[in-house]
Amino acid sequence: MSRNTEATDDVKTWTGGPLNYKEGFFTQLATDELAKGINEEVVRAISAKRNEPEWMLEFRLNAYRAWLEMEEPHWLKAHYDKLNYQDYSYYSAPSCGNCDDTCASEPGAVQQTGANAFLSKEVEAAFEQLGVPVREGKEVAVDAIFDSVSVATTYREKLAEQGIIFCSFGEAIHDHPELVRKYLGTVVPGNDNFFAALNAAVASDGTFIYVPKGVRCPMELSTYFRINAEKTGQFERTILVADEDSYVSYIEGCSAPVRDSYQLHAAVVEVIIHKNAEVKYSTVQNWFPGDNNTGGILNFVTKRALCEGENSKMSWTQSETGSAITWKYPSCILRGDNSIGEFYSVALTSGHQQADTGTKMIHIGKNTKSTIISKGISAGHSQNSYRGLVKIMPTATNARNFTQCDSMLIGANCGAHTFPYVECRNNSAQLEHEATTSRIGEDQLFYCLQRGISEEDAISMIVNGFCKDVFSELPLEFAVEAQKLLAISLEHSVG
């Protein structure tokens, strides 16, 4: 391990032992961190540290007050111990890399928000160990998020030459307030649900992207989220806007150190697609999975896209292999006539992981189309659930939907569950739904073993074939990474 990392016995077990989570290292560095607990004073302190304008503070406070009136939902098909929201710190950042660290010791001090203000040598080394480029050189633009703050954003100036805004959420509030105010909360309101309201109250850095009219983004845009501090949550807010006749492909990845207690990740993503625009949004999720109700990330995320204009198109693609519990439904509201929504998902659970994930396709405009391809793989003692909603509104004349929901079981102690909901309120709509549940057959394994292929390699090959419809939608280099993570997650799941 590099000099900035600390390896406990637990970390060594996870990173090099049977469970093989190589991203589980912890970065030792000075931090500026709020005390545990959440109240109105904490919300104000977060806003002050980020030097936000009054309108952003009001957005936070309104969401916090709405959150206080809500009850935490528990209808998902998964179990976790009751969370104590006063036992988390809601702001943690590396002590500013461009000063002598005295600011970190002053209560309420305002941190720097400029580019690379938090990129200390320890933080840069951590991202280097993760294989995430925080300096320009590779033809992919990266926004690197470390706990509550963005520490580096590459290719901003090159993208700006074409009018593309690619920056952290915090920088967008200061540099492009008119755009943030126009779109913030329009797709996911501050009081949308329990975890979205919590996010709106304590929102940390996510990524802000705006692609202007008629521009095709010349490179992949990406964000990497790293949780490092103990007993913190990550609550990034991401907004992506594709103006008329534009195109952008965006991908996000993530990881966290090994911890023996739950950490909460409650993000919100809002995507707005205007007339004739297209967005491809890909996720390779690799949060620390924990084991048998011990540690891991609780991944409770709200993601929603609004296809506002005619002929707009949104594609969600996700590979979910990490986190103790995944609870998320990337969704599309198809308001524009002839708009298209797509959802391609691979969700693998192993060990004692639990997942309740799927999508919602809300058809409002005429001639709207949606496609749902979901692949769920269960191994070990895990439980994997698909939950989807297809809703055809009365105005959605000639709406079309195709749903394919496939589950695969590996072993005798896991479970696969499906909860499809269909609501059709227009007689001209056409909906198709296919579903299968299968096991890896003994004859398949026997065939591979007879040809010198090990049992683990055989299972990996079969599972990759099962997932090919989804992996083909990912950018090539990320599809390769997703396949590797799938293989690692399946290790030692045989038997």
UniProtKB/Swiss-Prot annotation:
It holds the Pfam family SufBD_N. GO terms for biological process: iron-sulfur cluster assembly. One of its GO terms (molecular function) is 4 iron, 4 sulfur cluster binding. One of its GO terms (cellular component) is iron-sulfur cluster assembly complex. PANTHER family: FES CLUSTER ASSEMBLY PROTEIN SUF, UPF0051 PROTEIN ABCI8, CHLOROPLASTIC-RELATED. Part of the SufBCD complex that contains SufB, SufC and SufD. Interacts with SufA. The SufBCD complex acts synergistically with SufE to stimulate the cysteine desulfurase activity of SufS. The SufBCD complex contributes to the assembly or repair of oxygen-labile iron-sulfur clusters under oxidative stress. May facilitate iron uptake from extracellular iron chelators under iron limitation. Belongs to the iron-sulfur cluster assembly SufBD family. This is Iron-sulfur cluster assembly protein SufB. It comes from Escherichia coli (strain K12). The lineage of its organism: Bacteria, Pseudomonadati, Pseudomonadota, Gammaproteobacteria, Enterobacterales.
